[in-house]
């Protein structure tokens, strides 16, 4: 059977080999997947043009970042929007090197890279290039959010070009492996940049209880990761009798002092992204998608879906760069919300969740933590973090957290936490055993905590009683994994399945050099990790 498309960038790809039919598991159609490939080829061509001019401009950098972010899973399903992005990339390349077609140098040729060359390449080369490509796609999301807050890093921007050029033309396994690890290195800088942007703009996150009750009356649900969009919506809805509720990865917004000052930022609705079609069914309120993860909406709420920034879906109302949320506000007033307060619960029945244990909050108790470890009150730390998803087997993470010993601390971040963030695990020395550090990009904070603990005990991070148990779904998880590899973190447990884009040889390299292993059962993994 002829392949109508090829995509294997997410954890749920068909048969753990790749989506090749009329549509991907994520819902994007074959023609959309082909346009994403075409956009990536155009970005490689633009990157080669930048290589020729040596220094990347802010304008070019932002276009590359926007283009890469557009190709992340569950961001854009709109062919017209992707086609516009392709033309934007091509126009920028033409602006930089209008006479490029006369040059014989393959790094500056106007002929765009055909991604079929990558998908049909030697499996080890394809694997390494895929790690780089999916890594920079994830990193582009973080760079994009930082740029929205007027923070950027020239080294980060320049690396996007370097990495894209390597994807297009490098065939040396050694060079590609070096670039894989460098992707992790630069992503660490990118996450640090976003951490700085968020905290300098909105304040340092502080531990905050968040209700799961939705009050009666008009409301809007905001999902995604973009704090700036939430801020602007809060400003425009203030005093209008409309409450705002976060969803998914927007939950940590409640911990930022600047955003907490808005009294109508009430609580959190729903859980992780993969449950949205059930949770939003007949919802009497509109939903604003600021970033991924968007799923094709059901007819029962399709008229309530609003997108902004790079998120797009055919037929959905798109809020452009002017950020006039009037259509969203009018829809909220029209729908009217619930007639009475509605009390919802987390996956395990909890009525509230707590967030805001960022690296600053945890390290403010560093002395207490160190003494608790020395006294034997804390025997182990687990970072149970990453993406959630729909594939069976992800209840592993719920059971893992439930079964962690009472003398251990569980740190978490990203949307995978919704599997267990409503659990009450008790406290150790006044500190909760379960601490939510924030969004997926707050993996930077987890790294800072690990490094600080290692310094306090005079050892390496790998020598700490600390284990990484990660779940993955899309490309931001890939760049975070590469950052951990860059830092030399070993013995990571990864699931629910291993990436389809890892060839046997590359997977074996990661196993032999970093001890990466697939998850097994909570009981077996806890026992093994506690004894390492």
How would you name each of these model-derived features?
Residues 2-32, 36-37, 41-45, 54-55, ...:
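Anaerobic metallocofactor- and corrinoid-dependent redox/one-carbon enzyme cores
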Residues 43-201:
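Electropositive, gly/pro-rich neighborhoods at or near active sites that engage anionic ligands
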């Amino acid at each position: 059977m002829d392949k109508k498309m090829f995509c294997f960038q997410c954890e749920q790809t068909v048969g753990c080999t790749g989506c090749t039919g009329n549509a991907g598991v994520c819902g994007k159609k074959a023609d959309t997947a082909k346009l994403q490939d075409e956009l990536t080829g155009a970005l490689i061509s633009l990157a080669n043009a930048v290589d020729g001019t040596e220094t990347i401009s802010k304008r070019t950098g932002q276009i590359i970042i926007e283009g890469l972010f557009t190709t992340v899973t569950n961001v854009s399903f709109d062919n017209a929007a992707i086609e516009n992005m392709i033309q934007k990339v091509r126009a920028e390349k033409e602006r930089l090197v209008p006479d490029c077609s006369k040059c014989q140098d393959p790094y500056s040729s106007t002929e765009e890279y055909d991604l079929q060359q990558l998908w049909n390449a030697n499996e080890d080369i394809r694997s390494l290039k895929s790690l780089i490509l999916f890594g920079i796609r994830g990193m582009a999301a973080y760079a994009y959010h930082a740029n929205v807050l007027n923070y950027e890093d020239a080294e980060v921007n320049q690396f996007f070009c370097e990495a894209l050029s390597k994807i297009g033309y490098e065939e040396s396994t050694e060079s590609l492996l070096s670039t894989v690890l460098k992707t992790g290195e630069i992503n660490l800088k990118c996450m640090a940049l976003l951490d700085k942007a968020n905290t300098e703009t909105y304040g340092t996150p502080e531990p905050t209880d968040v209700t799961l009750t939705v009050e009666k009356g008009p409301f809007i649900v905001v999902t995604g990761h973009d704090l700036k969009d939430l801020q602007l919506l809060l400003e425009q809805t203030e005093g209008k009798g409309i409450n705002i509720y976060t969803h998914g990865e927007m939950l940590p917004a409640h911990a930022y002092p600047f955003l907490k000052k808005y009294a109508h930022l009430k609580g959190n609705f729903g859980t992780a992204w993969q449950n949205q079609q059930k949770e939003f069914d007949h919802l009497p309120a509109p939903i604003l998608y600021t970033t991924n993860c968007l799923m094709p909406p059901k007819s029962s709420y399709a008229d309530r879906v609003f997108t902004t920034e790079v998120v797009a879906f055919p037929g959905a109302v798109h809020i452009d760069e002017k950020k006039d949320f009037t259509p969203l506000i009018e829809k909220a007033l029209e729908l009217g919300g619930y007639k009475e307060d509605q009390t919802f619960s987390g996956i395990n029945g909890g009525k509230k969740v707590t967030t805001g244990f960022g690296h600053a909050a945890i390290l403010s108790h560093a002395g207490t933590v160190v003494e608790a470890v020395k006294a034997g009150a804390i025997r182990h730390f687990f970072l149970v973090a990453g993406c959630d998803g729909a594939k069976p087997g992800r209840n592993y993470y719920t059971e893992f957290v439930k079964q962690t010993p009472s003398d251990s601390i569980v740190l978490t971040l990203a949307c995978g936490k919704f599997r267990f963030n409503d659990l009450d695990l008790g406290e150790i020395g006044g500190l909760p055993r379960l601490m939510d550090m924030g969004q997926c990009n707050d993996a930077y904070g987890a790294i800072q905590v690990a490094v600080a603990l290692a310094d306090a005990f005079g050892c390496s991070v790998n020598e700490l009683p600390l284990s990484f148990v990660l779940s993955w779904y899309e490309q931001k998880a890939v760049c975070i994994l590469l950052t951990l590899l860059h830092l030399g973190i070993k013995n990571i447990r990864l699931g629910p399945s291993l990436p389809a884009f890892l060839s046997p040889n590359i997977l074996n390299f990661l196993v032999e050099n970093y001890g990466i292993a697939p998850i097994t059962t909570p009981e077996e993994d806890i026992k093994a990790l506690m004894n390492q």
